[in-house]
Amino acid sequence: MNDTDLSTFTGRSLLIDQLSSVTQGTPVLDFIDKLRIHFYTTIRQNLLKIDLKNICSLHDLTDQLSDFWLVYEQSVLESPILSPELDRILTCFRCLCRRYLPISVIESVLTEYLDQVLKVWLESKTNPCLDMEKFFQLCEKFKQLGLSSVLKERFVYVLQLHVGSLLTTRYAMSWEQSVYHEALEWIRTEFGVLVEHVFSLSNPAVLVQLDHLVSQILAHLRSDNILDIVLHYPNSLGAIEDLRLVARQKQQRQYLTETFVKDCTSSILTASSDSSYILLFYVSTIRCFVALDPPGVLLDKAAKPIRSFLNEREDAYKCLVSLLFVDGEKGLRSELSQIPTENIDSTTDRFDNYHWMPDPIDAAPDFKKPTDRDVVGSLISIFKSKEPLVKELQLLLADRLLQLTDYHYEVEAKNIEFLKYRFGETVLQMCSVMLNDIENSRFIDQSIHMENYVSKGLHVTILSRLFWPTLSVRYFHLPGPLKKELDAYAEEYRERKRKRELVFLPNLGSVELEIELEDRTLTLTVTPEQAAFISLFEETSTLHIEKAAELLDQPKEIVERHLKFWLHHRVLTDIGDDRYRVRETEAETATETVLDEIQGVSAVQSEAESSAAEMRVYWSFVVGMLTNLGALELERIHNMLTMFIPPPNGYTRTQSELREFLALMIKEEKLEFTGGAYKLK
């Protein structure tokens, strides 16, 4: 600022004389006009010359303007006519200051100054390099000059930055315990006195303002991390409690849900995400948002994109059913055991519901109140139809029951009982029959073994053919001793069940083998096909793969899978020219073999797999097309099959069924899919 003092703009004595002449009987309006003219012609011109570069120049400006007002005030107080109108004249003076002062420049300098003040205040509350008393005097002069709004606006802005930085540094990743009350006490202690001076408020009013500021910042901080908070549930219950306490305003709740949906869409709801992972994420979302907002308004908004995404996933049904039978954090069996208090289709809008409450004000038009906190019910309601879920449930149950080796099906039975609360008895009748088959099989097996008609090691599961899903059956030549035992078992069954016949499914089941070699003994649980294959080496020391296929009466491709299994377990060794022999000692050199994925394939076929298997009759036509025409797209293959396969057994499949079949051929390494087209491998 220039060295020119405001009192010398016209001379202090001259100014007093002019005002004195005005005050003697002159009306108030005339005095105000004189003040405006004097301010405009004299003070304003010098204000335009002020160069506000630092806080010192700001102090000088406020000091001199304050002195200038004291001159006016003295003249007004000396006049009995004007003294009652002091407030009115002060308002006029303040308006002139706001109009002609460079407010934007003042705000810039003041912001920098306030930043220094808050830093020093946090460090030690006192600092010889920064005169806090001088800062408080500056605050008083800002209020006197009508610039308190500028001071408060800038102070709030800087205070928000500092409080936000402090809360972020200390609490950004502290999610296990709620930090809301601790943060309130901390910020009150740090800034309470300073805010009281700046705003001239009593202590209770200051605390209310600081609490509101902390709530706003903490709500924004937790909302920005809402996706990670949900992902870390239940280790983030403290952060959820913070959100429950601070995210109460409509704008805060809207920002919370919008941030969650945006982050969820970009990070979770992607094509590369596994459906099981998304389902478990949805469960965490339900838990978090119900704790945050029990009425369910926020959950309704946050869950819509997740539910829509899962509804479009073809494998979501299968993944959900699989998770219902898995324990621990990676499954939902614990949720399945939580029996809902009401049927999931019931409504809360009943006339006899004396606890009815209106929807929250920020609820969407299609908002429906949750009838309970049944997570499984919420997952089931994702899908428009329950029929695909029931079919997948039947497939999974059949697969699990077929894997049993001791008739103990209590876990599966309990799961089905829990599901009956949600689907009803009638819908799950097929599952009940499958469970009943296992129980009946146990009684029949005990009865047959009680009379020592068959080997103690042979146990059979008897299935009611019409009530089980389609099974993947492959017939092969059984070893003589095993066939004899099975025939004896079937005869005993026929005697007990009035001539009813058993049809064995030879590739289904398991066999416990003990293989004795020269330097070791192996105990393995294998499939009947693998057991039949290795039994071929009891009669010969070496065997050609073609001969093995002939003896088993199976395709070479299937026999190769059995062979890989025994090579992997170092029971057989390759001696060249597709010939193999038993590996009697570990010391023998052999090629390491990686077991392929076929060992984990289920014996139960889904509808898509059954359809693909039935389409093998068209494989020769597909081979002919790809041989003569090269790589072809799905649509062209479909059109050519429709055109060239004549009735009455014409091609009537859909493109979706053809796609499943071609995918199966790719899995069997007969086709390749590149550039959107299929070609022979």
Curated annotation (Swiss-Prot):
Keyword check for Ribosomal protein: no
Pfam families associated with the record: ANAPC2, Cullin
Keyword Translocase on entry: no
GO CC term (a single one): cytosol
Keywords for the protein's UniProt record, in alphabetical order: Cell cycle, Cell division, Mitosis, Ubl conjugation pathway
UniProt xrefs under SUPFAM superfamilies: Cullin homology domain, Winged helix' DNA-binding domain
GO biological process: cell division; metaphase/anaphase transition of mitotic cell cycle; proteasome-mediated ubiquitin-dependent protein catabolic process; protein K11-linked ubiquitination
PROSITE patterns (UniProt xref): CULLIN_2 (PS50069)
PANTHER family given in the database record: ANAPHASE-PROMOTING COMPLEX SUBUNIT 2
Complexes and interactors: The APC/C is composed of at least 13 subunits: apc1, apc2, nuc2, apc4, apc5, cut9, apc8, apc10, apc11, hcn1, apc13, apc14 and apc15.
Protein name: Anaphase-promoting complex subunit 2
Species of the source: Schizosaccharomyces pombe (strain 972 / ATCC 24843)
Organism classification: Eukaryota, Fungi, Dikarya, Ascomycota, Taphrinomycotina
